[in-house]
Amino acid sequence: MGKFEDKKQLRCSFCGKNQEQVKRLIAGPGVYICDECIELCSEIIEDEFEGNTESSPLETSNLPKPQEIKDYLDQYVVGQDRAKKSLAVAVYNHYKRINANKAEDDVELQKSNILLLGPTGSGKTLLAQTLAKMLNVPFAIADATTLTEAGYVGEDVENILLKLIQNADYDVERAEKGIIYIDEIDKIARKSENPSITRDVSGEGVQQALLKILEGTTASVPPQGGRKHPHQEFIQINTSNILFICGGAFDGIDKIIEKRGTKSSIGFGAEVKGKSEKNVGELLKDIMPGDLLKFGLIPEFVGRLPVLVTLEALDNEALVSILTKPKNALVKQYKKLFELDNVKLDFTEEALKAIADEAINRKTGARGLRAIVEETMMDIMFDIPSEENIVKATITEETIKDRKDPELEKLPEGEVRPTLKTEKKNKARKDIETA
């Protein structure tokens, strides 16, 4: 009888209910917990976990609209309005698709990866980086020229996924919603439109290797990178929801487009067209998948990049805007550098145009702007820390074109400019005195 009473007295150590008042009582070393308390603890932990994590911008309610995405891109990338619109719509649809496919539905939305085509320095990489920054998703950049087919010297395509996992701090679930930008994708084109008899390990072979991860597969990634071997553990990652953006200059594809658009005719009534009738940017707008096949991409690869976004070569006006307008514009960066030495830096309008002209002449686009400014500023940046009477430097057109010294404003001989810290203290003291 005593044993029966003892059995009835078994109680939950948390809520005090006995075993007859609950569905289940789980025993531990000297303690008991009921099913109700387990459920309550689970809810508390779940709420706390959700409270500590940022609200994901990728949920349908938080997903930025195409117009908002373009407005954000406008803050960092100058020009390329058509490309920004196309990218904004493609990215919006991609993450909307991820949320839609979570629900059980007969219709499964397929992934649309993106191919960016445009000359060097037109903003392809910056667009992809800025998108990832806005969406707060892991982002990785890979160079297609370093990739080779499995079994050959070079990087396996799985190493691209490893970079993404590393940038997500090895949070695979987060990495599975990231963005991968593969640069120089035009360099893995095969040498001709026709299939090659010989092995093309860095061209067609890489395209074949990329097919599966572009489409969506569960890939095995070596956690330390390098080649796979059978005795190591792998990280499993599903690429179905990873957005792949491939970019390339595709030098010479304009001739393929032009050839397709010009029907050759013979005789007195034949229409003769000048080669310079359309510039490269205008021709790229007319690109078709067939042009990419002629360039050397295989049909299966082109099929997995259905969204074609073209960028135009930047003109003088656009390059000047890049120098001055974005949040992190190059001119603003150099002004800040000089400000740290308490020196004011100015660029004349003619100097900015001369920098842009030089970038166009070098055919380096926006990417070459920093190199030109750095070359111009080298001597003055060398002198300023030592010459403590310089308070202002003005970069003129002659400074850029003829490498003449900038126009300098100096204090009278014997005077030294105050350090930035001293000037701030003096200003604060003056504010207090006048208060």
UniProtKB/Swiss-Prot annotation:
The keyword Disulfide bond does not apply. Residues 1-53 form the ClpX-type ZB domain. GO terms for molecular function: ATP binding; ATP hydrolysis activity; ATP-dependent protein folding chaperone; protein dimerization activity; unfolded protein binding; zinc ion binding. PROSITE patterns: CLPX_ZB. Keywords: ATP-binding, Chaperone, Metal-binding, Nucleotide-binding, Zinc. ATP-dependent specificity component of the Clp protease. It directs the protease to specific substrates. Can perform chaperone functions in the absence of ClpP. This is ATP-dependent Clp protease ATP-binding subunit ClpX.
